[in-house]
Amino acid sequence: MVGRSRRRGAAKWAAVRAKAGPTLTDENGDDLGLPPSPGDTSYYQDQVDDFHEARSRAALAKGWNEVQSGDEEDGEEEEEEVLALDMDDEDDEDGGNAGEEEEEENADDDGGSSVQSEAEASVDPSLSWGQRKKLYYDTDYGSKSRGRQSQQEAEEEEREEEEEAQIIQRRLAQALQEDDFGVAWVEAFAKPVPQVDEAETRVVKDLAKVSVKEKLKMLRKESPELLELIEDLKVKLTEVKDELEPLLELVEQGIIPPGKGSQYLRTKYNLYLNYCSNISFYLILKARRVPAHGHPVIERLVTYRNLINKLSVVDQKLSSEIRHLLTLKDDAVKKELIPKAKSTKPKPKSVSKTSAAACAVTDLSDDSDFDEKAKLKYYKEIEDRQKLKRKKEENSTEEQALEDQNAKRAITYQIAKNRGLTPRRKKIDRNPRVKHREKFRRAKIRRRGQVREVRKEEQRYSGELSGIRAGVKKSIKLK
């Protein structure tokens, strides 16, 4: 209906223009006649709209004809540009990029397919999957088929399965490497432990506040070998002092002849001294709190300890001889000391010695007199100083008194306290606790006159200890 009305309006408008003749035109040749009616297409469309409408009609007509004829060939239409844009360079660049991307994709496809083909070629044909699905379906393997099979066929199948399992096991064993036998796969699941610097975790303790028991406990925990080394040091030093040094003196005196025995004593003496010096060095490290676990002194101590243990066999053999030599030396020393003790007895003094002693006494008396004079002189100096000090104090008090006469008068105690008209209170009222205590004491005194105090029995009569005898009379007769 709308199309028919539009056509009628257009026909009427064409008839009117034909009757009117030629219309006015502008400089560009555009028609300047009467405006179009609402029913005409030019009322709401311009030339661009007319062009697009004609193009869509042609496309629809062509498509309808192709559908009717059944022709499936696609025809390319030439498009006419309405508003041409200069997009040639950008199209070329886009086309080039697209071509490069396509080439890369093709290359990737070719590379992937080649790698896949190489991998498939390297795989053992017995391990590769088949190309047909039918091989893996519709088989007779199952409980029903087993019932129909004979015992020989079942045993043969079991043997084949066992062989196949052994082949798979060998193949897996060949694929194993050295890394598979380690614990790296376990360490991969382990939680990372945060590494803390020793300087951060080090706690400095005040050892002065720690008890002796705790100190020993800490010492045994940090270095258990320290106490053993200290005891060993004491033992070795006593052995060097009491046994080896006296024996070496006998060697130097020639009592012990030179030979293997003297060489053994010198070796043992040097070994013990070196061992003790290394222990003392170890104790110095411990006193300075230097870590000695990796120090070379530990290895040196171990070597010396091993050498001492080797000498223990010789010590057991020579222990009796060493004791005999030490006893002989002690006896000789005692014999030397006995005559010296006898010679220390007092002897009668001669006249010359007595006179010398008297002179010494007189000298001492002279010295004592000199000391007394020095003391008296010192006391006099002290008295003079005290007198001067007193004079200075008296002079200062007089000067202050003269100054105070001209100065202002000091305030009194009453002015300083500023108590005003407050009433006078007793001294006992200052402390309530003492006040109530005194009150309680006086109340107890008053109560003694009102109520008699309870007196407990001190000792109850328990009868005569030896019984009462009727014949004994202890009364006094009146005369």
Curated annotation (Swiss-Prot):
Compositionally biased region (Acidic residues): 69-111, 153-165
Major subcellular location class: nucleus
Cross-link (Glycyl lysine isopeptide (Lys-Gly) (interchain with G-Cter in SUMO2)): 144
Post-translation changes: Citrullinated by PADI4.
GO molecular function, one term: RNA binding
Residues found modified as Omega-N-methylarginine: 8
Biased composition (Basic and acidic residues): 450-461
One Pfam entry name: Sas10
Modified residues (N6-acetyllysine): 144
Subcellular localization, as worded in the UniProt entry: Nucleus, Nucleolus
Phosphothreonine found at: 362
Biased composition (Low complexity): 11-21
Domain of life (superkingdom): Eukaryota
Subunit structure: Part of the small subunit (SSU) processome, composed of more than 70 proteins and the RNA chaperone small nucleolar RNA (snoRNA) U3.
Family: Belongs to the SAS10 family.
PANTHER family documented for this protein: SOMETHING ABOUT SILENCING PROTEIN 10, SOMETHING ABOUT SILENCING PROTEIN 10-RELATED
Function statement: Essential for gene silencing: has a role in the structure of silenced chromatin. Plays a role in the developing brain. Part of the small subunit (SSU) processome, first precursor of the small eukaryotic ribosomal subunit. During the assembly of the SSU processome in the nucleolus, many ribosome biogenesis factors, an RNA chaperone and ribosomal proteins associate with the nascent pre-rRNA and work in concert to generate RNA folding, modifications, rearrangements and cleavage as well as targeted degradation of pre-ribosomal RNA by the RNA exosome.
Name this protein carries in UniProt: Something about silencing protein 10
Lineage summary: Eukaryota, Metazoa, Chordata, Craniata, Vertebrata
